[in-house]
Amino acid sequence: MLTLTAGKKAAMDRLSTQEGIISALAIDQRGALKKMIKALDVEPTDAQIETFKELVSKELTPYASAILLDPEYGLPAAKARDTEAGLLLAYEKTGYDATTPGRLPDLLADWSVLRLKEEGADAIKFLLYYDVDEDPEINHQKHVFIERLGSECAEEDLPFYLELVSYDAQIADATSLEYAKVKPHKVNEMMKEFSKPQYKVDVLKVEVPVNMNFVEGFAPAETAYTKEEAANYFLEQSQATDLPFIFLSAGVSTELFQETLRFAKEAGSTFNGVLCGRATWKNGVKPFVEAGETAACDWLKTEGRENIESLNEVIAATASSWHAKVQVNEG
């Protein structure tokens, strides 16, 4: 069981519903958001990125327990959020250096946990790419790095949300059938690793342990797992950690993400909510770029709101409270 300080527990409460479910909105994307704008044949400006994040925050945080933003483009959006929504701030540099092996992590050079806290962060989020079967020397560097981060968050008494994204150094395409077959092992083993106490992680933000596009009954063509096998991987995932954990949406469609959460619940998963990003807001980028702020607001007030409210209904029916996974150290 995770032991929280009173300060971390209060911060966790600010990020969650009263029931202890995390229904958070992620728009800390930087590189991915720029790519979405570029795909519409427009060169993105910093002001555009800031404005889009601000609109999403203003229109959608009334329906979220918290919002995840980056301090590079997201601080105006943080100020525009609903007063009841908690704030997570990202601490990692976007992307990774593809020229060096190992996808080594890096921090934003201008920021520290103290400075993010001063900007109003209720928690710190860090993204780590991790391959459990990577060269041990590379993984050793990652372990040491996360130990430092955990200690820095503990010193400032802020919850540490670690986002883990799996990969295989030998498989280039993470959407392939080949990768789908090894994904359960990759996801569940890395969760075991980073649940160890030396990392001081409070919440794991993780992928679902299978590629749903290759699950029997969901797969358009080839399958990597039967429904029963997939369900077992979800159950194994919950058994791999005693920490609160939440699912990321990984850019899949709103419909598939909701179906996935239902499948997880039926399998016995004890996930504690979601940090859902593109599945909620990605279709708002086009009206924003092509028709401006008013068109984007219209989309967010209708389709965007519908996406988040229908997701909230599914989360309420499928997620478990993290309250049962923690105890508070009042000392």
From Swiss-Prot:
Top-rank EC class of the record's enzyme: lyase
Record EC number: 4.1.2.40
SMART domains linked to this entry: DeoC
Gene Ontology molecular functions: 6-deoxy-6-sulfofructose-1-phosphate aldolase activity; tagatose-6-phosphate kinase activity; tagatose-bisphosphate aldolase activity
Chemical reaction(s) catalysed: D-tagatofuranose 1,6-bisphosphate = D-glyceraldehyde 3-phosphate + dihydroxyacetone phosphate
Coiled-coil residue spans: none
InterPro entries (alphabetical): Aldolase_TIM (IPR013785), DeoC/FbaB/LacD_aldolase (IPR002915), LacD_aldolase (IPR050552), Tag_1.6-dipho_adolase (IPR005927)
UniProt xrefs under SUPFAM superfamilies: Aldolase
One of the GO BP terms on file: D-tagatose 6-phosphate catabolic process
Any Pfam family matching the protein: DeoC
The entry's keywords: Lactose metabolism, Lyase
Family: Belongs to the aldolase LacD family.
Protein name: Tagatose 1,6-diphosphate aldolase 2
Organism, scientific name: Enterococcus faecalis (strain ATCC 700802 / V583)
